[in-house]
């Protein structure tokens, strides 16, 4: 039986108490100061760290410019339609995720609960990135930058052994920032410096959300616009760097054969899906504060296009920096080889250059074979292509690769401050959406809001997240961060959004939803949106769900990358049983909300019917 939303009373008919309550709630609900605040809030939430550190990595992995083909196709068939769907649901129901899906059907309340659980998991670990951003920002004012050189050993007779085997940027990240343990089984204690940075990050979030849309609406102007200012500055600087063209040519040279690679399409769909923040409930929460007549279709298109354009723009910046770093390392490698051969064979200074290096190497190998064989093991194989092929994503790109490029720039402190300030703004903008996804359903709840004011609810949520997030500041914290980042949301969000599309199209009814949209926006629903919602997007999500589920099953024993201080590099290890249990709990705790809440609703309804039935 389809569960309908109660219609307004017809003329001459007195509205019932439920309808009066709904109207009072609609009137009392806070709203954005203007539509621009809503758009900026969505952009600030959607445009996040993934645009800067994951999309460039995918371009690098899957054929440079050719990756844009599946990416743009997935934007059209998946990104825009699903974004519009969530904005329309939030604006129509004018409630957070739990209330919105309960209005469509009481049996779907679990969809909103699952979104809140996933958003809670995300908030716990995501703000740790902002804590790291604060840590690097504070250290960016030092001259020289603390990650530019290796520290001396305890005897002050040479450089630290771990740093020499790795690099100064890796050492600062793994030892000075994380103080990482050798494995996930050695948790260590909470480290006070990262803990203070995490506390500061949560304090910033709390101040931004303290007054709801009143404060968030003003903050999003800054968190949305500031990253673009920094990216433009970095683009101008990046294009003037030596070797930037090498990186840009690498990015825009398409490898057409990658279009036949299924993983390129899978990753394009996944990037669109997670970059827009679908399924978390944040977009529904933001849209619930809109005017009912707001043109959410136009805003969905604007936000999705800006989000994807930012990914491409950030990639141009990243690859120009990447080209500079690769060229710097390549030329540094050549100089070391030239110096080695010049000293070993007593060559005249300036005789050996990069242009004649290979020719001279062949000559020396044929003329002095014995001596050359002694030197040969110390001659590095320098290749610009191999430097450009070194693919890094996530924290490795943000805190190691970028840091390494920045330390070699002139006025490196300035560029470091700008870069890590930009990361902070991107991270804070996303955190505003994550916390809105949690707070909106809680403040909508009459049970909770009748006992606690909004400020207290916000403070309690931030305090709990901050306390639990201290796990990520331990010596093994980065390993737990990777677990949450890899497993807390992937399958859960796919299932949530799949149920959302089915709920709107087949439970609430597509025709009925189309009628609601016509009443809100004054325009009919285009066939494109209906086809995407009813058929294409659900099938695509099912395909992604099957792929990730089979990938987890076929992978066998799950593994992680651990830092080996003795080798100065990452090594692969198997997850211990307790870590596997946490992974299973993360996936199950959110996905099981949907069937369990539906079952609980069914049982409660049956008990109510049984209790009200007359006794024979």
Swiss-Prot record:
- Name the catalysed reactions: L-proline(out) + chloride(out) + 2 Na(+)(out) = L-proline(in) + chloride(in) + 2 Na(+)(in); 4-hydroxy-L-proline(out) + chloride(out) + 2 Na(+)(out) = 4-hydroxy-L-proline(in) + chloride(in) + 2 Na(+)(in); 2-methyl-2-(methylamino)propanoate(out) + chloride(out) + 2 Na(+)(out) = 2-methyl-2-(methylamino)propanoate(in) + chloride(in) + 2 Na(+)(in); L-pipecolate(out) + chloride(out) + 2 Na(+)(out) = L-pipecolate(in) + chloride(in) + 2 Na(+)(in)
Q: Which residues are glycosylated?
A: 155, 381
Annotated compartments: Apical cell membrane
- Which processes are annotated in GO (biological process)? amino acid import across plasma membrane; amino acid transport; amino-acid betaine transport; glycine import across plasma membrane; glycine transport; L-proline import across plasma membrane; proline import across plasma membrane; proline transport
- What are the transmembrane regions? 38-58, 67-87, 104-124, 190-210, 219-239, 266-286, 301-321, 414-434, 456-476, 490-510, 534-554, 579-599
Where is coiled-coil annotated?
none
PANTHER family in UniProt: SODIUM- AND CHLORIDE-DEPENDENT TRANSPORTER XTRP3, SODIUM/CHLORIDE DEPENDENT TRANSPORTER
Function of this protein?
Mediates the Na(+)- and Cl(-)-dependent uptake of imino acids such as L-proline, N-methyl-L-proline and pipecolate as well as N-methylated amino acids. Also transports glycine, regulates proline and glycine homeostasis in the brain playing a role in the modulation of NMDAR currents.
For this entry, the protein name equals Sodium- and chloride-dependent transporter XTRP3
Which source organism? Rattus norvegicus (Rat)
């Amino acid at each position: 039986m389809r569960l309908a939303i109660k219609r307004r009373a017809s003329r001459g008919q007195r509205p019932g108490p439920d309808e009066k309550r709904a109207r009072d709630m609609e009137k009392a609900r806070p709203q954005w100061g203007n539509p621009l605040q809503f758009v900026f809030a969505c952009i600030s939430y959607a445009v996040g760290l993934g645009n800067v550190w994951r999309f460039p990595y995918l371009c690098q992995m899957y054929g440079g410019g050719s990756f844009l083909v599946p990416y743009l196709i997935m934007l059209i068939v998946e990104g825009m339609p699903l974004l519009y769907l969530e904005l329309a649901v939030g604006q129509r129901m004018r409630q957070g995720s739990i209330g919105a899906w309960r209005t469509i059907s009481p049996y779907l309340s679990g969809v909103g609960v699952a979104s809140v659980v996933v958003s809670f998991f995300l908030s716990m670990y995501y703000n740790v990135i902002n804590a790291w951003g604060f840590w690097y920002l504070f250290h960016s004012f030092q001259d020289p930058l603390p990650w530019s050189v290796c520290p001396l050993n305890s005897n002050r007779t040479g450089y630290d052994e771990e740093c020499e085997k790795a690099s100064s940027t890796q050492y600062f990240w793994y030892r000075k920032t994380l103080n990482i343990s050798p494995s996930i089984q050695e948790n260590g204690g909470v480290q006070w410096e990262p803990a203070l940075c995490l506390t500061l990050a949560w304090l910033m979030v709390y101040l931004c959300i303290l007054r709801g849309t009143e404060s968030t609406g003003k903050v999003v102007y800054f968190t949305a616009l500031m990253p673009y200012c920094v990216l433009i500055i970095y683009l101008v600087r990046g294009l003037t760097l030596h070797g930037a063209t090498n990186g840009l040519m690498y990015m825009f040279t398409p490898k057409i054969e990658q279009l036949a690679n299924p993983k390129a399409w899978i990753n394009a769909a996944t990037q669109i899906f997670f970059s827009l923040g679908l399924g978390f409930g944040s977009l529904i929460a933001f849209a619930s504060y809109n005017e009912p007549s707001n043109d959410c279709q136009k805003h969905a298109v604007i936000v999705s296009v800006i989000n994807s354009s930012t990914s491409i723009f950030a990639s141009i910046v990243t690859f120009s920096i990447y080209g500079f770093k690769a060229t710097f390392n390549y030329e540094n490698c050549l100089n070391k080889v030239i110096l080695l051969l010049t000293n070993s064979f007593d060559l005249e200074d300036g005789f050996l250059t990069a242009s004649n290096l290979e020719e001279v190497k062949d000559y020396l190998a044929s003329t002095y074979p014995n001596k050359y064989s002694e030197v040969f093991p110390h001659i590095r194989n320098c290749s610009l292509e191999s430097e450009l092929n070194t693919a890094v994503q996530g924290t490795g790109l943000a805190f190691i690769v970028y840091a390494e490029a920045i330390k070699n720039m002139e006025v490196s402190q300035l560029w470091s401050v700008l870069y890590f300030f930009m990361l902070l703004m991107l991270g804070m903008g996303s955190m505003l959406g994550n916390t809105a996804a949690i707070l909106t359903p809680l403040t909508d709840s009459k049970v909770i809001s009748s006992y606690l004011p909004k400020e207290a609810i916000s403070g309690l949520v931030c305090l709990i997240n901050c306390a639990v997030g201290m796990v990520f500041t331990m010596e093994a914290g980065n390993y737990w961060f990777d677990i949450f980042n890899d497993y807390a949301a992937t399958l859960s969000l796919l299932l949530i959004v799949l149920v959302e599309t089915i709920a709107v199209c087949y439970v609430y009814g597509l025709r009925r939803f189309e009628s609601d949209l016509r009443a809100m926006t004054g325009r009919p629903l285009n066939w494109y949106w209906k086809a995407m919602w009813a058929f294409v997007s659900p099938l695509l999500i099912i395909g992604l769900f099957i792929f990730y589920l089979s990938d987890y099953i076929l992978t066998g024993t799950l593994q992680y990358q651990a830092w080996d201080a003795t080798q100065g590099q990452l090594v692969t290890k198997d997850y211990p049983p307790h870590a596997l249990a946490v992974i299973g709990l993360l996936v199950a705790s959110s996905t099981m909300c949907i069937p369990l809440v539906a079952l609980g609703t069914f049982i409660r309804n049956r008990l109510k019917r049984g209790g009200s039935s007359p006794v024979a």
